[in-house]
């Protein structure tokens, strides 16, 4: 991964990464990785919250979309970004989302 270009991360994704850490050393590793690879953490705005609630209404039943993933998708759409994720099941059906799935 090149360090020179900017990458964006929703605050929801950032919190999920920290939540998975088992100890303070892993917390530090996550923070250092985000900083060293120039990730910009994007906040939840009113528009993101509104769009995420619409996604929950539209996609939670047919595709199992949960609140956290709705916030992540809405953050990408509101910032005109392509979302890259291995969570293909939940994101592929969102019509206005630019999405690239991958298998780890």
Residue spans of the language-model regions?
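Short, active-site-adjacent cap segments at secondary-structure transitions
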Residues: 16, 90-91
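Flexible glycine-rich beta->alpha loop in the catalytic core of nucleotide-sugar glycosyltransferases
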Residues: 82, 89
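Short, flexible helix/strand-to-coil boundary loops that buttress conserved ligand/catalytic motifs
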Residues: 21, 95, 103
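PIN-domain endoribonuclease scaffold, especially VapC-family toxins
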Residues: 1-63, 67-81, 98
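Histidine- and aromatic-rich ligand-binding microenvironments
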Residues: 10, 65-66, 87-88, 103-104
């Amino acid at each position: 991964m090149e360090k020179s270009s900017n990458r964006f991360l929703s605050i929801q994704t950032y919190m999920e990464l920290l939540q998975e850490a088992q100890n303070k050393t892993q917390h530090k590793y996550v923070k250092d990785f985000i900083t060293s690879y120039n990730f910009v953490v994007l906040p939840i705005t009113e528009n993101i919250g509104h769009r995420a609630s619409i996604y929950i209404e539209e996609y939670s039943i047919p595709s199992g979309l949960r609140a956290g993933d709705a916030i992540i998708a809405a953050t990408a759409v509101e910032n005109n970004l392509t979302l890259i994720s291995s969570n293909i099941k939940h994101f592929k059906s969102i019509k206005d989302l630019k999405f690239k799935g991958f298998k780890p």
